[in-house]
UniProtKB/Swiss-Prot annotation:
Manganese or magnesium. Binds 1 divalent metal ion per monomer in the absence of substrate. May bind a second metal ion after substrate binding. The keyword Transferase does not apply. Pfam families: RNase_HII (PF01351). Transmembrane segments: none annotated. CDD domains: RNase_HII_bacteria_HII_like. This is Ribonuclease HII. It is found in: Cytoplasm.
């Protein structure tokens, strides 16, 4: 076995290996960070930070994308019950359009860390981008399948965002947010083409911006004819 990646692809990966490395380097209060919602055409990007007791095992916790919705909901409660601290940060659609999705994601991650009731001593972050915070940290590609703390954060972020999109489905019917959660499903693209974008759509994203109402000259502007005015 070499590092975290076993020579036998069927061998299980030690989801506590990264946490163990940080502990051996003298870091304590380790928090895993992940996000949900970078790719959708609508809604927020949600980040979560989870700090687990050292050595805690959480059977079933893995990359949230590999779990069923029912399993994620079940583990969401388990993580909240077993974790030392859980924090959530949200970058709404307006922030995404204002500063771009990467910067909105990092902002949400920073807010999630700040929301922790215990100040972390080390951050394990899914992805390749550091969070602009004065806390020792390590980025991990595919971290939600390599670190238990990051995997737990991915579940918290995913369930939190999914619940928000179900609420938005009731607020903006016709788009199917409860089913596709704002991602670019064929039914979602068809709804945008038919109804036009709604207020929570990301207006800088392809698939949405093409359907924004044109901005007429102020001298010739008449009443808005779209379903939603911006």
């Amino acid at each position: 076995m070499t590092g975290l990646f076993p020579d036998n692809p069927e061998a299980p990966i030690d989801l506590l290996a990264l946490e163990g490395q940080a502990l051996r380097r003298g870091y304590f209060r380790i928090a895993g960070i992940d996000e949900a919602g970078r790719g959708p055409l609508a809604g927020p990007v949600v980040a979560a930070a989870v700090m687990l007791p050292a050595g805690l095992l959480l059977p079933g916790v893995n990359d949230s994308k590999q779990l069923t919705e029912e399993k994620r909901e079940e583990l969401f409660d388990v993580i909240h019950r077993e974790a030392l601290a859980v924090g959530v940060g949200i970058g709404d659609h307006a922030l995404v359009d204002s500063i771009n999705i990467l910067q909105a994601t990092l902002s949400a991650m920073r807010d999630a860390v700040r929301a922790l009731s215990i100040t972390p001593g080390f951050l394990l972050i899914d992805g390749i981008s550091n969070i602009p915070m004065n806390i020792p940290q390590r980025t991990v590609k595919k971290g939600d399948s390599l670190s238990l703390s990051i995997a737990a954060a991915s579940i918290i972020a995913k369930v939190t965002r999914d619940r928000m999109m179900v609420e938005y489905d009731a607020q903006y019917p016709g788009y199917g947010f409860a089913s596709h959660k704002g991602y670019g499903a064929a039914s979602h693209l068809a709804a945008i083409a038919e109804l036009g974008p709604c207020p929570i759509h990301r207006k800088t994203f392809s698939g949405v911006k093409e359907h924004l109402p044109s901005q007429p000259d102020s001298d010739t502007a008449g009443p808005s004819t779209g379903l939603f005015s911006f």
